[in-house]
Amino acid sequence: MAYRKLGRDSAHRKAMLREMTTQLIMNERIVTTETRAKEVRKTAEKMITLGKRGNLASRRKAAAFVRNEVADVHEEKDAVVVKSALQKLFSDVAPRYKDRNGGYTRILKLAVPRKGDAAPMVILELV
């Protein structure tokens, strides 16, 4: 499988992709460079596909990749409900795409490049 190295060693690249995928699931949009967005798109689409399957093996594969971070905290009937990124993936994000076969993300190019190095910036969001 072909992939971009992104100027990092394999452990750093994998950690960065895991973190950015988790942030995309939690916030449903991130601002990043174009090349990073194209790589994160691949992993995010795979995680959403696992979420659509919803079986135990899919949950375990997704749990091995998505970081265990708090995605949402709210109150329901005198109890505080804390939802992790993995729970949000399986209960909120994946059911939204049950009738869609792939293409869960969208890349929108920003008009202004990054200030320091003029890297092309994009918004990666869930459709």
UniProtKB/Swiss-Prot annotation:
GO cellular component, one term: cytosolic large ribosomal subunit
A Gene Ontology biological process term: translation
Assigned keywords, A-Z: Ribonucleoprotein, Ribosomal protein
UniProt-listed SUPFAM superfamilies: Prokaryotic ribosomal protein L17
Entry-linked InterPro entries: Ribosomal_bL17 (IPR000456), Ribosomal_bL17_CS (IPR047859), Ribosomal_bL17_sf (IPR036373)
Single GO term (MF): structural constituent of ribosome
Oligomer status and interactors: Part of the 50S ribosomal subunit. Contacts protein L32.
Family statement drawn from the similarity comment of this UniProt entry: Belongs to the bacterial ribosomal protein bL17 family.
Protein name: Large ribosomal subunit protein bL17
